[in-house]
From Swiss-Prot:
The gene is ATG27. Residues 19-172 form the MRH domain. It is found in: Cytoplasmic vesicle membrane; Golgi apparatus membrane; Mitochondrion membrane. The lineage of its organism: Eukaryota, Fungi, Dikarya, Ascomycota, Saccharomycotina. Residues 1-18 form the signal peptide. This is Autophagy-related protein 27. Regulates the cytoplasm to vacuole transport (Cvt) vesicle formation. Keywords: Autophagy, Cytoplasmic vesicle, Disulfide bond, Golgi apparatus, Membrane, Mitochondrion, Protein transport, Signal, Transmembrane, Transmembrane helix, Transport. Its main location: membrane. One of its GO terms (cellular component) is mitochondrial membrane. Residues 214-266 are cytoplasmic. Belongs to the ATG27 family. The chain crosses the membrane at residues 193-213. It comes from Pichia angusta.
Amino acid sequence: MLHLITPLLLLLARFSMAIDISDEHFSAYPRMKELIGSHLVSRTEETPPSTKKITWYLKITDSGSGSPKDDTFPSECPKDSQLCGLTEISLPNRDPVITEVFSFSNKLTPQFDVNTSSFIVNLRGANWGAYTLDAEIEFVCASDDNAEGLKLVKFDYSTVSLQYKTSSACKSNETPPKDGKNKAPKDDDSNSWGVFTWLFILLVIVMASYIIAQAWINANRVGSSHEFLNELVESIVETLTKLPEFLREIANKLFTSGSRGGYSAV
């Protein structure tokens, strides 16, 4: 009987943890294990004469780990919370007072949305009195230099949006983008050389066609294959003789037009 109860308890434990990196959706992110535990982010607002501070606590677990790290939340958060928000009001010369508690139970089923350089965990349907709250937690692949940790993007008493920029959110085969952006690869010399190579090949084909056509026309007047070969050789020599002058004229036109176009009237 015991061997049937143990797997059942493990299965129930897995379904009672929403952000659980043992879930198959995290299989492409092996470094997410580095984020196991509790994380928090706070935002403070001046509301004279008081000060309002809201703090969000996020718990990331691993039910498949033999020794899971379980950092506890503040006592004001319900025990089954895996995302919890606390609003604290402070007045001069008085102890802070907790006025609002937002809790996302670990019984909520997460929904996953994978983008190019991030993935989002959505938690929907948390109860807060007569209201319903949703949570959006975005994990962004970032280099260690651009990592920002947990960040509160938005909270409007309807949806809370959190963002976590870290290299731990990168896929196993993904390189963190520099400056937080996926930059387009720079043009290298091989691309430009390819253009000039094709232009050179095209020029050679045109010249060869011109030489053969000219030799063929001249040879038809005589009607001898021997004369055709002579005409072909003469056409090649004549074309090669005129080639330097032809290239010089093209270069002069290019550089002359380029220097004139470099200035504008003021």
